[in-house]
Amino acid sequence: AHDLRSPMGSIKMVLNMLILSLPPSQIGEEMYQMLSMANQSTEDVFALLDNLLKWTKSQIGKLNVVYQDFNIVENIASVIEIFNLVAGIKNIKLRYLGDDKIEVHADIDMMKTIMRNLLSNAIKFSYNDSEIVVGARIVDDSVVVSVRDSGKGMSEEDQRKLLNTETHFSKYGTNNEEGSGLGLLLCLDFAVKNGGRLWFESEEGKGSTFYFSVPLKE
């Protein structure tokens, strides 16, 4: 996975640049759609490799938590900006509702990994022309970050299996996007390692909301 990550990162960067610099009016709608599909596939593979590497390191105790005090809202905004392009392929709007500044005590990279996975999943299971709302609010001595979609949702049986290492699974997204099911387990692991937790609410056919909490700056 480590040997594949660098070349995949280069391919991902080139495809992103092409999509940004070559609008449909210049290369035609069909070619633009093919380019968008290639970009999405590359994003999925890169995310899988990244999750696999981090999960492996975490399980063998080689991934240390580096605590810092930082504004998690800036962290959230940077991830949303990255995913605007991916969401745009399905004409999905990403919106943030919350305070402009919430200082937390956590590992910056791990928080970004959680946000990337939750947003990626929300886009994957959302329908075209919909909206995903990201929120952040202070609850007691923690911040609770939420990612809400109005997509496929989950059955009660799937909800019971989702965050269990023995029964976790993966399903196709609304545009037949693939996944490994590993991302949410990594999110759960990182949330707990930072003194927080991860949970969700879902209703089949109506969508899901995923939450994670981390301690506020003291």
Mark where each language-model region is:
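Short helix-loop "hinge" at the ATP-lid/N-box region of the Bergerat-fold HATPase_c
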Residues: 122-123
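Short alpha-helical segment of the dimerization/phosphotransfer core of two-component systems
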Residues: 37-45
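Short conserved segment of the HATPase_c
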Residues: 154-168
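Coiled-coil phosphoacceptor/dimerization helix of two-component systems
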Residues: 44-55, 75
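Helix-loop junction within the histidine kinase core
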Residues: 56-67
